[in-house]
Amino acid sequence: MKFKKKNYTSQVDEMDCGCAALSMILKSYGTEKSLASLRLLAGTTIEGTSALGIKKAGEGLGFVVQVLRADASLFEMKKVPYPFIAHVIKNQKYPHYYVITGANKNSVFIADPDPTVKMTKLSKEVFLSEWTGISLFLSPTPSYQPTKEKTSSLLSFIPIITRQKKVILNIVIASFIVTLINILGSYYLQSMIDSYIPNALMGTLGIISVGLLLTYIIQQVLEFAKAFLLNVLSQRLAIDVILSYIRHIFQLPMSFFSTRRTGEITSRFSDASSILDAIASTILSLFLDLTIVLMTGLILGLQNMQLFLLVLLAIPLYIVVIIIFTPLFERQNHEVMQTNAILNSSIIEDINGIETIKALASEQERYQKIDYEFASYLKEAFTLQQSEAIQTAIKTTVQLVLNVLILWFGATLVMHQKITLGQLITFNALLSYFTNPITNIINLQTKLQKARVANERLNEVYLVPSEFEEKKTELSLSHFNLNMSEISYQYGFGRKVLSEIKLSIKENEKLTIVGISGSGKSTLVKLLVNFFQPTSGTITLGGIDLQQFDKHQLRRLINYLPQQPYIFTGSIMDNLLLGASEATSQEEIIRAVELAEIRADIEQMQLGYQTELSSDASSLSGGQKQRIALARALLSPAKILILDEATSNLDMITEKKILKNLLALDKTIIFIAHRLSVAEMSHRIIVIEQGKVIESGSHSELLAQNGFYAQLYHN
């Protein structure tokens, strides 16, 4: 099958190359799926997409997928089933996928998901040096039916625009009046040259001049009103576009965040700004610039049709400039946004890990990495700016040449007494009101190109379904027993992290899960709060499958306190009350901080509960952060608490006091701990090794068994 250029798909984020390659093959057979959907089907992780993931996704969409390890002899076959996907180590540095669209004796033709490369050819020598040999061949099954997923174009923003129609109308009216005043000023110049000066009409000149001055004052008032309304419009559009993105981000499942770098998510805010800029510019161009072009075009035609026809000759040149620069701007905008996302991720990562960087004395090493990424971003941004500057220079040259031709031809008409000098000067003055709006419309190309790329990137987030899409009624429970039946879980299509877990936890039981690092302890408890869905098996609470619960209700019933408690910017009181009921009393707050053994620490601070904290709470010790987070969890209405290494930063004495307090509570508490002193005090201990429950019992029972737990305890 011949690969068509229209089927090319570029990757949006760093780890999208596998899904983008799959998308190209699917398009060749009439199926269109967003990269967001393909990431879900292929089990893409933060490390990228595996060949197995692409195989599973293809099979799920009605294809037979063969994964083979081939060599150079593949291209010597008479019938090679193009296009196919090849796994490569690009530039001998990082794993990547190409779509192979054809080959000849010396070259291999590829479609590279990298938007800076797109469709090109490589010498066979270069390709074979990169190719790992792994190749994926897709062919439709007899029952295959093409499917097309709906994605939002820039037209989807029309409802947002129409909501602001009153503001837009006022901006257009103000701009229209301002332009009319400027046109009147041009005719004043014509009358002055052709009538008032030759005929010495001093009185008329004075009256007209004063009138024009007053008109210009009104014009500036309208200019201010227009600028004010533009700011209002910009802010309202920002609320609609940026806040809706943030709202959607908060509603996405944990799997979305675990498979993307932070910078890839935050860089979409600047993408949204590009869309806002394009929307605002498009509104003004559609409603104002087009109107002014038509109006001034009519006036210029009435002024002198020969000169006006000369002006119209420049428009095809502008159109040619747009067509030439369109693919260039698309590619360069993609690259600028992608390098910006990588840079943002690194900066956020390094600021969050600054303590570790300083502890390892690796400031220079991390700086050099950011320096390299920043240089890459600047290089791409500079290339884009150069292209924009070249386009601007071409447009300006066309405009200047046009002005010279107008004056040249117009002067000839004046010499032949076909028009007056005043008419020529007025025509030249009015010309800017015709060409400037055309220039504004042409300038939309760059903004709309950037906005289209930005919209594609936003779509990849918007197309990830919210975890709250299904409206579920709150369920009433007669008891709070937890039961896990044959639970297995794996990230993407990698190895199983959990395998056939069977576990029952009674209401008010105090249970500790132990095991070496990487055994699956944290993953198991995250399934209990629906952060991730089990690959197989069921989990019930009160006899009801967790999938039937509204997630907000479930997380109010089961509170998970992660290994790294997060303290938010605000006061200690703000942090304590996050997630608590609005009716929480002072007595309940005091009770919670006492149970967490943090009351004395807080009350010794100068501002007590009103002490302001930054997001990293650098003024607090690790143990204080953990205890504030624990008090916050205790203030939640949860019947079940999951404490993932929640006391790991505490001294043994404080930890023992807190454990004693927690064991006395009328709640189910699940501890995850490396310190076996926590396990000793709990009712039951579950030992996990390589994703399986291998032992269960009390501390004394497990020691008596002399198994894995006993080894951990004695060692």
From Swiss-Prot:
Residues 11-138 form the Peptidase C39 domain. Its EC number is 3.4.22.-, 7.-.-.-. Residues 168-450 form the ABC transmembrane type-1 domain. Its main location: membrane. Keywords: ATP-binding, Bacteriocin transport, Cell membrane, Hydrolase, Membrane, Nucleotide-binding, Protease, Protein transport, Thiol protease, Translocase, Transmembrane, Transmembrane helix, Transport. The keyword Iron does not apply. GO terms for cellular component: plasma membrane. ATP binds at G515, I516, S517, G518, S519, G520, K521, S522. The keyword Transmembrane helix applies. The active site is at C17. Residues 482-715 form the ABC transporter domain. GO terms for biological process: protein transport; proteolysis. It is found in: Cell membrane. One of its GO terms (molecular function) is ATP hydrolysis activity. The chain crosses the membrane at residues 167-187, 197-217, 237-257, 282-302, 307-327. It is a multi-pass membrane protein. Involved in the export process of a bacteriocin lactococcin. PANTHER family: ATP-BINDING CASSETTE SUB-FAMILY B (PTHR24221), ATP-BINDING CASSETTE SUB-FAMILY B MEMBER 6 (PTHR24221:SF654). Belongs to the ABC transporter superfamily. HlyB family. This is Lactococcin transport/processing ATP-binding protein LcnC-like. It comes from Lactococcus lactis subsp. lactis (strain IL1403) (Streptococcus lactis). The gene is lcnC.
